[in-house]
């Protein structure tokens, strides 16, 4: 297995921002959820995908830059999955290509509560999610400097700790069923080659597949 994905500095930064936002959002949500976000952006033309789970404390994602259709508007999709329940879907038209602004709009439109997000130095981020009976004037007056020192000037308490890591969980056992439809026509799939390379749609990991594996 190999990844070998290389993005432009701009796309790499957006992917990191989106993954950071998803981790903070997962921490602000109940434990049993798996959440996936997809953003379809006009400029730069890219489909950005991130997904994570508090159950497994893992997150992964990638950018799709090849054969991407230009959407009429920048679109942001969110899917929340809980075991034994139908996934909850929402979609938003977003004005910018900034993941932080997407997530603030997600809170405004889909979470039914406001959220404030701040990008701090040294790749640190803050997400403040409003709770019932919150002080609206105080909440909306905060800036990045206020957010950076909030633990020092406000009374706070750690409710729980979740430790996320970059991990997709993909492997050949999960990838091979995708090729099940080619089992009866391997010549069309391999085209004379001894092996082919297939890619995980979630993280971009590449796997080498030979005829005897199908």
Stretches found by the model and what they are:
Residues 1-158:
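Interaction interfaces in information-processing and related assembly proteins
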Residues 130-214:
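Cys/His-clustered metal-coordination modules, chiefly Zn-binding fingers
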């Amino acid at each position: 297995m190999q990844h070998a994905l290389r993005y432009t500095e701009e796309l790499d930064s957006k992917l990191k921002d989106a993954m950071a936002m998803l981790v903070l959002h997962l921490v602000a949500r109940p434990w049993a959820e798996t959440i996936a976000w997809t953003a379809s952006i006009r400029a730069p033309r890219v489909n950005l995908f991130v997904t994570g789970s508090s159950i497994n404390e893992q997150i992964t994602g990638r950018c799709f830059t090849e054969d991407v259709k230009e959407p009429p508007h920048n679109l942001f999709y969110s899917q929340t999955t809980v075991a034994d329940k139908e996934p909850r879907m929402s979609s938003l038209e977003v004005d910018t290509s900034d993941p932080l602004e997407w997530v603030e709009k997600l809170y405004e439109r889909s979470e039914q509560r406001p959220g404030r997000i701040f990008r701090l130095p040294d790749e640190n981020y803050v997400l403040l999610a409003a709770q019932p009976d919150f002080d609206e004037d105080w909440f909306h007056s905060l800036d990045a400097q206020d957010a950076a020192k909030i633990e020092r000037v406000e009374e706070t308490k750690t409710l729980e700790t979740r430790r996320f890591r970059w991990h997709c969980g993909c492997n050949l056992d999960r990838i091979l069923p995708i090729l099940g439809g080619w089992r009866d026509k391997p010549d069309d799939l391999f085209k004379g080659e001894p092996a082919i390379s297939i890619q995980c749609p979630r993280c971009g990991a590449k796997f080498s597949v030979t005829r005897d594996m199908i």
